[in-house]
Every structure is written in structure tokens, then in C-alpha cells.
């Protein structure tokens, strides 16, 4: 397989294909000289005469060149050498080709006509018809490309210069850097920077490269410089050494001191011109020397505005077309200089990060066998930061796997010194002590916390939170995404190390405690001091202990206490409190304590609280009477199942959020809640004993109200509100106020906890309250809901509609189209007979356990449908084949539809009928023409015992990623079969003879059917080995196919496979393969269960179908090339065993094995 341009290191920039008879001493010599002037390397053959023995060198030069410039001249086609060069160029899929028509009309080359065509025909007389056709196609293909026609140029020198500029522009976007490690992803950065630089403009433009330390700003800038410098007569990369020296020069000086600025400018001009000790006698001299020069200047790691103003103060200091690029981690610094064109360097994707790490650790883009999971783990530990990836890779390079495993704990817990040194520079450069304090606070306690929460908790801290956050963002030390503050893992660890350095011996002397063992020590031994501002203790990382009775006595400044588990594993109380404990000096602002062991809260803990969070506590009550907790904003007692009452909140008037979800012992809400005029959220879900709500609500600020599964709640009060999210599902509410209206409601969920129709008012009274603002509506278990009124058509913003277990619902409105609706769920509406038709924009359609009898032909109008599930539809009899016309459809399930007998077009209005004939296609030509261009599906017909399977099996225009059918034998449709029953965890092989025609296509396609006996889901993997008579071999590893919906029984598991037929761009037919061994390996989705492969079969499929043509490159939407999922890496062990078995059963000949994808590159895809 040819290397991609993003990973290939090229020997030459250009290969020039030409006829020496026409252009050797004219065009060629001038063009090569222009390339030299632009520092573009080109392959030369001046001193060699072409002979047969030199062809391998020419062939290699073509492969090693990034761009091919093909000069078509009158006699080009007279040379078989030229035509073979052209053919080789075209066969290199990664080659950029620039055609030049020099003294010849492009149409003569394109169609091989005129004088050019006559010469071509003479050359072809000595060749076979096959060679002639290959040359013709190559000439036509290249002549159809955008190029240069000399007839349109009056000045050949200008044409040559323009061709060279075109080459340079293409190299700018595609050339790799000197280091393969640094080249990964660099093209994307260069392309984005090219847009900002706007090189074609004559203006002088200043551009900033902005990003956090270690993210690769300098790497990008150097790659840019390597490519751009050829464009500029004067160019200089000003590195950090000069910048640091300039800082020292300026340090302590008067910013307005002209002598200091003159000195800086003199040093700067010396750097640019490469001369020592240039003296400048006035501040305008720098501009005078450069204003007529097209200049490229890149300044690295600068954040001092005075220095920047002195060096590149104004655009008119530089000549037309100049570009000044400034690299910094301070965005405000760029804005202050008037630089508006700023490129933000973001972290690489997870996949790119792993490639970068592999380049550093292995010198390749992918890991060796056995290192896959370690690479994923270490790339995550580096947080995808390029600096971390490089440092970690260098530390592990050349080491054995055992060493890597031993190093993991150190990488998890300790920050590498080189990384910390680099990142600490960014911290030191913050300058403002308040901003530094907030940086440490975020690193230790507030990473991934809402901005609003940070603002509330630090409202009176004097830290100027909003300004400090903005400054940290500008310096690339944090990001704010979705209203949450995010700090990179390595920056976070740097901040924590800064705090640890405050006291290496006594953690009680640090401002923040974040190491759980240190926190445990301070709390259990009572050694905390007034320096401690915050404690975070992850209970999942410590053993059980008791807090010292004087633990809080010395920590009078403690503001933030977080004792919680960072895992989802339930655990017993880990942190105990003694009966006599001194709380009086502690007044935290935030108290988070999972499984708090006391029955009542200590009062002193509450006085200044802004946030109180006590999940799964032992509390029975919070406090007595009406306490004046005016600072309290959030009260979260989730899952405190012993809590019997909510205290008087009448004096806690600033509360914005109350969460008593899963507090099973609560019986009522206190009447004082109606005084909470700032309340935004009230969550009471799963409060199973809650019976009544206070009346007289006037909570105009309330936005979210949740009474889900409050089974005993029977009344709902009238109250004024601007609520947007109301959840009343699984309640026993019998009646709603008649004038209840929510004008701003966006999400509404309601339903009954029982099905007693006598107590159910139904949904009709709710119709008037349904506002056009509604985006989500859930109606659950409403027995007397028979139909929906036509007023539904007014819900133009509705995106999701769930009507579930409404067993008497018979119809939906017709003649309406809810254009915003993308998800419709009618699960359990057993009397609904007609397929819904209320929106053609639906993506997700759940019709499980409905009474629908057919999927009609109109299903083809659901253009955006991606998932259709109709499990347990016992009345379903027919499914239209039009379902396969939906190109976005990926998952279909008709399992347990016992009445389903056919999947066909019998109800299509044109009257198209199915055709059956022995040994013939089962679908007519007319039917086939109406099927889709491409469709990749996961289909489930499990337990559809009456289904006619033939029409489905014969669909070659559909690519089945997985299909489950009923049956206990391989259908006759599969022409190659085996019947040897295989127990759990084993494999089976089928030899298939190959015809030359089957290897002349770009893909080898086949369909597999495995008869599987299993109790639950299974995975089936495929491995193919092509073999020839001379011992040559070619391996292909397919994906792992997921059949996780399988239930206990015997089923047919069917899936399609596609193998790319290539080996370094040579068709397999040239490698003389005469048969292929196709092997499948089956494993259970649950290690506790067994699976038996009873028999299996294969049918070869035609290639070149419309589906194949649309899908094109195998690295597109086909599941065979999707990314591996970490959870199933263990499957590779089974496949390797399979390969080993095959190897052992054959004669040795490993040197002849060409592997399409090495085992380390095997990829998994799981359909969920």
C-alpha cells in the first residue's frame, strides 16, 4: 500500500517527465533553474542515457518524488520511456500531477488525435493491445487535469515562474517536516495558517500563533518557515535565545528609554541580515532598512509588549507582501499589538495523539504487537499534549514491554521534570498574584467545575474571578467549554506540584490537599494549620479511618472540604467522626461529603455555606427551626434515604438549587419553599413517600421541576412559573388545575404510576398547556389516551415525542408534518395499527410492541431515518423493500415479529412484483433499479419464524454489517458450505477456488452465514489467506462482527466482507493467487456463556456494484476499517491463535507473505 502524503518522507520535491528531443535545452533547463531559485529539489537525469538497466532508478525516483510535472510536447508520445514514466506516475496514487502542454494542443493529448496521435500510434505498433490501452488511459487521465498550456502565454519565462509557484504552493500544503514525528497533523495546521496568512495579498500582515505551552506552536512555526522562506528575499526565524536575551536587556529598564529600544532594534536587524553589531542611531532606521524588502519574520515565545513594539512596531516598517508571525501563549498580548489574525493551536485528536506518541516511542505511526493498550493509556496520561507525548515516548523508546508496565504507575503519579519545567514557565509568566492563586485553586479543586459555581464560591475572595478567568484563558492555561472550566491534565499536575512544594514534609502546611493519603493523614492526625484552604479526599483511594477530634480546630481558614468517592462503586462509610469533635473554628463555603455518618448537621458547618452536597448520607434532619443561611445557594441531599423532613427554608432565601432525589423517607415539601424566589431547580425524583405539595407557589424563577416516580403524589398545585422543564411521569396525580399553562415549557413528561382508568384524567386537559416552545414531550402509561388531537400540528419546535405504554392509543394525527421532530417512540402502544406519518425528518423510530401490520412503501420518504426498531410487533406481516432505499439507515430490528412473512415490494403503488426462479436472481430488473445506491445495515429478524428469507438474502446492493435470521441450516443461497460443528472459542476454514476475473476487481466481496447456538450475544471475526501455486501468500484481517442482540437459541448470523485487492498498487491477478482460505472465529459476548458454531457457508458477491462505487475507498464508511475499541482488544489473542494454526499447517514460506493489514492494525467495530 502506498504511503499517504501525510506520513511519507519524500526524497525529491519534483520529478520532471519530458521528451529530451523537444525541451531538454529550452523549457527543462529554465524550469530547473527556477526550481533551484525557490529551493525546490528536483530529480535530474542530465548525465545518464536512458537504457533498460536504468529503469529501476527512474521508477524509484518517481515514487520518491512528491510532485510530477509532465511536459507534453510534440514528440512526447514517440518515446516508450516517456509513456512508461507517465504510466508509473499515474499508478502512484499519492502523486500530485501537474500537466504542461508545451507546443501541443491539450485535446490532441486527451484524445490521441492530430500529429500527437499519429506519433502515438507509431509507438504503439511495437506494443501489445493491453499496453496501448494502458498508455491511452494514462494520457487521457492526465490531460484532463488542470495544467498549463503554453499557447496561452506570451512570455515563456513568466509561465515557467508561474508553474514553479504552483509547485511551491502545493508543497506548502503537503510537504512533511524533517521529523516524521513532527509531521503528524502538521498539514492541517499549515493549511489553516495559510488561510490567515493570505500569501497572495500584497498587504503587510501580522499573524499570531497562540496556544498553551507544549502544544506544538514552535513545531508549526518552523514547518511554516521551512516552506515560506523561499517566497521571501529576507527571512528570519527569531528563536527563544534571542527573545530571552531581549527580555534581560529590557528587564528593569524604563519602557520609554529610547537607548534601550535602539539597542533592541540593532540586535534585531543584525539577526535578520546576518551581520554582527549593527548600530542604529534613530528609531526610524529599522523601517528604512526593511520597508522595501518583502520580509518573513517569525518570533518565537514572546510575551513582552515593549519588546514586540520595538522589533515589529508597525506594518509600514516592512515591504509589500511581508509577513510577521508572533508565537505566544498570551492572546491579550497579541490583541494589544493590534494583531487580529490569530491561529489557536488546539490539542490533537485521540488518534493523532497516539500516532505522535508511537513516532516518538517506535519511529512508526502504529504500535508493535502487544503494545496497543499501553499506547492508549500513555497517550491519555499525556493528555494528548505533544510535549508530553514526545517526552514519554523518548523515555520509553527501545524498552521492553515489561519496563513499560513498570513505568505506568510512575507516569500516572509523577510529572516528568522536562514537562514540568516547560509548563511552570507559563505559570511564572502569569505575573499577577491573584491570577496565580486562581490557577492553583483550579488545578487543585475546580477543574471541570461550572464557571457559575466558581464565581459564587469566590464571590468575596478578592480574587477578581471574572478578570482572572479571562486572563488565564488568554494565556492558554485554561479553557472554558460549555460553561465549565477545563485545565489540561499536565498543567493541573504542574499546579498541584507547585502547591506540594509549599511544604514537602508536612502536608498540613499547604494551602490545598489533593492527594488522598495526605488528606487522610491531616484529618486523622489533626495536623492541619490555618494555611489549609481546601481539602479533597477520594474515599475510594483510602482505607477506613476516624477523623481526629481536633482535626478542624487548627484549620480556621478552611473554605472547601470535599470528601467523596470519584468512582461509581458503592462503598460503606469510610470516614467516621468521633462523638466529641471541635467544629467551632470551621466555616467552609463548600462542603461535599458522601455518606456523611451523623444524623444531624453541626450548625457551625452551615453558617457560611454556599454549597452543601451530602449524597447517600445518614442524616435524618439538617437543622432545627428557621436558620438565616443567606449565603446558601445549593442544597443537594441526593439519596439521603433516612432524611425524614426538609427544614424551614424561609430564611435561606438565596437558594437556587434543591435536590432531594431518591430521599425515600420524605413525606412532604415544607410550605416555606414558596418563599424561595430565586429557586431555579427543584428535584424530587424517586421520593416514593411524597404525598402532598404546598399551595400558593409563586416561583417565577423556577426553571426545572422533577417529580418523576413520586408514586404517592396525588395533587398538583396551581402556581405561576416560567418553568421550561417539567417531569411528572410515574405519579398518581388525578387532576391538574384547569388554568395551568406553561408558556415557556420546552420539556414535558407526564404519566401514571398505575393503570387505574378511573383515577386517570388523561392527556386532553393538558392540550391547552402545550406551548409551541415545546421540544420534548413524554406521555407514559395513560390508559384513556385514544388519539392525539390535530392541535399537535402547532408544536413546530417538537424534536422528540415519546408515547409509551398508552395501550389504547389507536391513531396519530394525519396530514401534518412536524418538521423539527427527529425522534419518535411509540413503545407498547399495542392498539396502534397504522405506521406513523407525522414527520419525514425522523431519525430514530421506536415502534416496539405496537400493533402495526406493515411497513409501507412510503417508508422511502423517511430520508433521514438512521434507526428503526419494531421488536415484538406480533401483527407485523409485511415490510416494504423500500426500507433499503434509505441511505442513512444503519440499524433495523424486527425480532420476535412472528407474523412477519415477507420483505418485498408487493404494496408498491406501481405494482412491481417479486419474481422467483430457480438459480436466478429473485428480484426483477425493475425492482433492482429502484433500490438504493448504497446501504450499510445492521438488521435483526430474530424469531421471525414465518419470514421468507430469500428476497433479503439476494440483496447485493445492501452491505450487511450484521443480520440475524431464524433458521438452523445454512440456506442454499450460500454456495460454499461446511457442517463441522465447532465448540466455544474455536474456528473453522473454507477453501474457495479463485478465477482471474475475481481478482481483476478492486475489491473481493463475499457474504458469510454462520449457524450459531448461543445463549446471548456473540462476536464473529474473519481472517482470509490468498495463496498461489508458487507459495506466495497474502493475508487480510477483517473486522469483528457484533451480534449482541442474540437471545438463547439457534440463529443465522449473516454479514458481508470486503477485501481491498492491492499490494503496492499491483493487482492480485498479477501475483497468481488461485484460491483463498476464509476462516471465521467465534466467541461469546459473555465469558460465562458458551457458543457453538454448528455450520457455516459463503457466497461470493459481485464487485463493482453501485454500492461499492459509492463507497469507494475502503477507508470510508465500511465497518471493516472502523477504529478498534479498547474493550475488545482481547479478541486479537483468539485471531492470532487462528493465524498460528494456519501457519503451522502449511509449509514454511514466511518471506512470501504479504499482509494487507498487520495484526497490530486489526480493527474492531461494534454496533450498538
UniProtKB/Swiss-Prot annotation:
Catalytic activity: NAD(+) + H2O = ADP-D-ribose + nicotinamide + H(+)
Disulfide bonds: none
Keyword Cytoplasm found: yes
UniProt record, GO biological process: defense response; regulation of root meristem growth; signal transduction
Main location: cytoplasm
Conditions for induction: By DFPM in the root meristematic zone. Induced by salicylic acid (SA).
CC terms in the record's Gene Ontology section: cytosol; nucleus
LRR repeat ranges, renumbered to this chain: 539-562, 606-629, 631-653, 676-699, 701-720, 721-744, 795-820, 839-865, 873-896, 1065-1089
Gene knockout outcome: Loss of [5-(3,4-dichlorophenyl)furan-2-yl]-piperidine-1-ylmethanethione- (DFPM-) induced root growth arrest and inhibition of stomatal closing mediated by abscisic acid (ABA).
Any one GO molecular function term: ATP hydrolysis activity
Alphabetical list of Gene3D superfamilies matching this protein: Helical domain of apoptotic protease-activating factors (1.10.8.430), P-loop containing nucleotide triphosphate hydrolases (3.40.50.300), Ribonuclease Inhibitor (3.80.10.10), Toll/interleukin-1 receptor homology (TIR) domain (3.40.50.10140)
Listed EC numbers: 3.2.2.6
PROSITE patterns registered for this protein in UniProt: TIR
Subcellular compartments: Cytoplasm; Nucleus
Reported function: Disease resistance protein of the TIR-NB-LRR-type. Part of the RPS6 locus that contains a cluster of several paralogous disease resistance (R) genes. Resistance proteins guard the plant against pathogens that contain an appropriate avirulence protein via an indirect interaction with this avirulence protein. That triggers a defense system including the hypersensitive response, which restricts the pathogen growth.
UniProt record similarity statement: Belongs to the disease resistance NB-LRR family.
Entry's free-text remark on domains: The TIR domain mediates NAD(+) hydrolase (NADase) activity. Self-association of TIR domains is required for NADase activity.
PANTHER family cross-referenced by the UniProt entry: ADP-RIBOSYL CYCLASE_CYCLIC ADP-RIBOSE HYDROLASE-RELATED, LEUCINE-RICH REPEAT-CONTAINING PROTEIN
Protein name: Protein VARIATION IN COMPOUND TRIGGERED ROOT growth response
UniProt organism field: Arabidopsis thaliana
Amino acid at each position: 500500500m502506498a504511503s499517504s502524503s501525510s506520513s511519507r518522507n519524500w526524497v525529491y520535491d519534483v520529478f520532471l517527465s519530458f521528451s529530451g528531443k523537444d525541451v531538454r535545452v529550452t523549457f527543462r533547463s529554465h524550469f530547473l533553474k527556477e526550481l533551484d531559485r525557490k529551493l525546490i529539489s528536483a530529480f535530474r537525469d542530465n548525465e545518464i542515457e536512458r537504457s533498460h538497466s536504468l529503469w529501476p532508478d527512474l521508477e524509484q525516483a518517481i515514487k520518491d518524488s512528491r510532485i510530477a510535472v509532465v511536459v507534453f510536447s510534440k514528440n512526447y508520445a514517440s518515446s516508450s520511456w516517456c509513456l512508461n514514466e507517465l504510466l508509473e506516475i499515474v499508478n502512484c496514487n499519492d502523486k500530485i500531477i501537474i500537466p504542461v502542454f508545451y507546443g501541443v494542443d491539450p485535446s490532441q493529448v486527451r484524445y490521441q488525435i492530430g500529429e500527437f496521435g499519429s506519433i502515438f500510434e507509431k509507438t504503439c505498433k511495437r506494443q501489445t493491445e493491453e499496453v496501448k490501452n494502458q498508455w491511452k488511459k494514462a494520457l487521457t487521465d492526465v490531460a484532463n487535469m488542470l495544467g498549463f498550456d503554453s499557447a496561452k502565454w506570451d512570455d515563456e519565462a513568466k509561465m515557467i515562474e508561474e508553474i514553479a509557484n504552483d509547485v511551491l504552493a502545493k508543497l506548502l500544503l503537503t510537504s512533511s517536516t524533517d521529523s516524521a514525528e513532527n509531521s503528524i497533523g502538521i498539514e492541517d495546521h499549515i493549511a489553516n495558517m495559510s488561510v490567515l496568512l493570505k500569501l497572495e495579498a500584497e498587504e503587510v500582515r501580522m499573524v499570531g500563533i497562540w496556544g498553551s505551552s507544549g502544544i506544538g506552536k514552535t513545531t508549526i512555526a518552523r514547518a511554516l518557515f521551512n516552506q515560506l522562506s523561499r517566497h521571501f528575499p529576507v527571512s528570519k526565524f527569531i528563536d527563544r535565545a534571542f527573545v530571552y536575551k531581549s527580555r534581560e536587556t529590557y528587564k528593569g529598564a524604563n519602557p520609554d528609554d529610547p537607548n534601550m529600544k535602539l539597542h533592541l532594534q540593532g540586535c534585531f536587524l543584525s539577526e535578520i541580515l546576518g551581520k554582527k553589531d549593527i548600530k542604529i542611531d534613530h528609531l526610524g532606521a529599522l523601517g528604512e532598512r526593511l520597508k522595501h524588502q518583502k520580509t518573513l519574520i517569525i518570533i518565537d515565545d514572546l510575551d513582552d509588549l515593549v519588546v514586540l513594539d520595538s522589533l515589529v512596531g508597525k506594518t509600514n516598517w516592512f515591504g509589500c507582501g511581508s509577513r510577521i508571525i508572533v508565537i505566544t501563549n498570551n492572546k491579550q498580548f497579541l490583541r494589544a499589538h493590534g494583531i487580529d489574525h490569530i491561529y489557536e493551536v488546539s490539542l490533537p485528536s485521540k488518534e493523532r495523539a497516539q500516532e505522535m506518541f508511537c513516532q516518538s516511542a517506535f519511529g512508526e505511526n502504529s504500535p508493535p504487537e502487544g503494545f496497543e493498550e499501553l499506547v492508549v493509556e500513555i497517550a491519555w496520561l499525556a493528555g494528548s499534549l505533544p510535549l508530553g507525548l514526545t517526552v514519554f515516548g523518548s523515555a520509553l523508546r527501545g524498552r521492553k514491554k515489561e519496563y513499560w508496565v513498570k513505568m505506568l504507575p510512575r507516569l500516572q503519579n509523577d510529572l516528568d521534570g522536562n514537562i514540568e519545567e516547560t509548563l511552570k514557565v507559563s505559570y511564572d509568566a502569569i505575573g499577577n498574584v491573584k491570577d496565580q492563586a486562581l490557577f492553583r485553586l483550579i488545578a487543585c479543586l475546580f477543574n471541570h467545575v461550572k464557571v457559575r459555581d466558581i464565581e459564587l464560591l469566590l464571590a468575596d475572595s478578592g480574587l477578581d474571578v471574572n478578570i482572572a478567568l479571562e486572563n488565564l484563558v488568554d494565556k492558554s492555561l485554561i479553557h472554558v467549554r460549555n460553561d465549565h472550566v477545563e485545565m489540561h491534565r499536565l498543567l493541573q499536575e504542574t499546579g498541584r506540584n507547585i502547591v506540594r512544594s509549599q511544604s514537602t514534609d508536612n502536608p498540613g502546611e499547604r494551602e490545598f490537599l489533593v492527594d488522598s493519603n495526605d488528606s487522610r493523614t491531616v484529618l486523622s492526625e489533626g495536623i492541619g494549620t490555618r494555611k489549609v484552604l481546601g481539602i479533597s479526599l477520594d474515599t475510594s483511594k483510602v482505607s477506613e479511618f476516624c477523623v481526629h477530634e481536633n482535626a478542624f480546630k487548627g484549620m480556621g481558614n478552611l473554605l472547601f472540604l470535599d470528601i467523596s468517592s470519584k468512582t461509581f462503586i458503592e462503598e460503606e462509610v469510610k470516614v467516621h467522626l468521633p462523638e466529641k469533635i471541635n467544629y467551632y473554628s470551621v466555616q467552609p463555603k463548600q462542603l461535599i461529603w458522601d455518606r456523611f455518618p451523623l444524623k444531624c448537621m453541626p450548625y457551625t458547618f452551615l453558617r457560611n455555606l454556599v454549597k452543601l452536597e451530602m449524597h447517600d448520607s445518614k442524616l435524618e434532619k439538617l437543622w432545627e427551626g428557621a436558620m438565616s443561611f443567606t449565603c446558601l445557594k445549593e442544597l443537594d441531599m441526593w439519596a439521603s434515604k433516612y432524611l425524614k423532613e426538609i427544614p424551614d427554608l424561609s430564611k435561606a432565601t438565596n437558594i437556587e438549587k434543591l435536590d432531594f432525589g431518591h430521599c425515600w423517607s420524605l413525606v412532604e415539601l415544607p410550605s416555606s419553599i414558596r418563599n424561595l424566589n430565586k429557586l431555579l431547580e427543584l428535584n424530587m425524583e424517586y421520593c416514593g413517600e411524597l404525598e402532598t405539595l404546598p399551595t400558593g407557589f409563586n416561583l417565577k424563577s423556577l426553571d426545572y421541576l422533577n417529580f418523576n416516580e413520586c408514586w404517592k403524589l396525588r395533587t398538583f398545585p396551581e402556581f405561576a412559573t416560567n418553568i421550561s422543564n417539567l417531569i411528572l411521569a410515574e405519579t398518581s396525580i388525578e387532576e391538574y388545575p384547569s388554568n395551568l399553562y406553561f408558556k415557556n415549557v420546552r420539556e414535558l413528561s407526564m404519566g401514571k404510576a398505575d393503570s387505574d382508568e378511573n383515577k386517570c384524567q388523561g392527556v386532553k386537559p393538558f392540550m391547552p398547556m402545550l406551548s409551541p416552545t415545546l421540544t420534548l414531550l413524554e406521555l407514559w402509561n395513560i390508559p384513556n389516551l385514544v388519539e392525539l388531537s390535530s392541535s399537535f400540528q402547532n408544536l413546530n419546535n417538537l424534536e422528540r415525542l415519546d408515547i409509551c405504554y398508552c395501550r389504547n392509543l389507536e391513531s396519530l394525527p394525519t396530514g401534518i408534518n412536524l418538521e423539527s421532530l427527529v425522534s419518535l417512540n411509540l413503545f407498547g402502544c399495542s392498539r396502534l395499527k397504522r405506521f406513523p406519518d407525522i414527520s419525514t425528518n425522523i431519525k430514530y423510530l421506536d415502534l416496539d410492541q405496537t400493533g402495526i401490520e406493515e411497513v409501507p412503501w412510503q417508508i422511502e420518504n423517511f430520508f433521514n431515518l438512521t434507526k428503526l426498531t419494531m421488536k415484538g410487533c406480533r401483527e407485523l406481516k409485511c415490510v416494504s423493500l423500500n426500507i433499503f432505499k434509505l441511505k442513512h439507515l444503519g440499524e433495523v430490528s424486527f425480532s420476535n415479529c412472528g407474523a412477519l412473512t415477507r420483505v418485498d415490494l408487493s404494496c408498491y403503488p406501481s405494482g412491481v412484483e417479486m419474481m422467483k426462479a430457480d438459480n436466478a436472481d429473485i428480484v426483477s430488473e425493475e425492482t433492482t433499479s429502484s433500490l438504493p445506491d448504497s446501504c450499510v445495515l445492521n438488521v435483526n429478524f430474530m424469531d421471525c419464524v414465518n419470514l421468507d428469507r430469500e428476497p433479503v438474502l439476494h440483496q447485493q446492493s445492501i452491505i450487511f454489517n450484521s443480520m440475524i435470521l431464524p433458521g438452523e441450516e445454512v440456506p442454499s443461497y450460500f454456495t460454499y458450505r461446511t457442517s463441522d460443528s465447532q465448540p466455544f472459542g474455536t474456528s473453522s476454514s473454507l477453501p474457495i477456488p479463485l478465477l482471474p476475473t475475481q481478482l481483476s476487481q478492486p475489491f473481493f466481496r463475499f457474504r458469510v452465514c454462520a449457524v450459531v447456538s448461543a445463549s446471548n450475544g456473540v462476536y464473529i471475526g474473519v481472517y482470509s489467506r490468498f495463496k498461489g501455486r508458487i507459495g506466495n501468500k497474502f493475508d487480510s484481517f477483517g473486522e469483528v462482527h457484533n451480534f449482541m442482540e442474540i437471545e438463547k437459541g439457534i440463529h443465522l448470523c449473516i454479514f458481508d466482507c470486503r477485501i481491498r485487492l492491492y499490494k503496492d498498487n499491483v493487482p492480485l491477478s498479477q501475483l497468481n493467487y488461485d484460491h483463498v482460505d476464509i476462516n471465521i472465529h467465534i466467541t461469546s459476548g459473555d465469558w460465562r456463556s458458551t457458543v457453538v458454531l454448528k455450520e457455516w457457508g459463503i457466497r461470493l458477491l459481485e464487485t463493482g456494484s453501485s454500492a461499492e462505487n459509492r463507497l469507494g475507498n475502503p477507508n470510508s464508511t465500511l465497518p471493516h476499517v472502523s477504529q478498534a475499541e479498547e474493550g475488545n482488544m482481547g479478541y486479537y489473542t483468539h485471531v492470532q491463535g487462528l493465524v498460528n494454526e494456519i501457519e503451522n499447517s502449511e509449509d514454511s514460506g514466511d518471506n512470501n507473505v504479504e499482509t494487507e493489514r498487520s495484526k497490530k492494525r486489526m480493527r474492531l467495530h461494534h454496533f450498538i
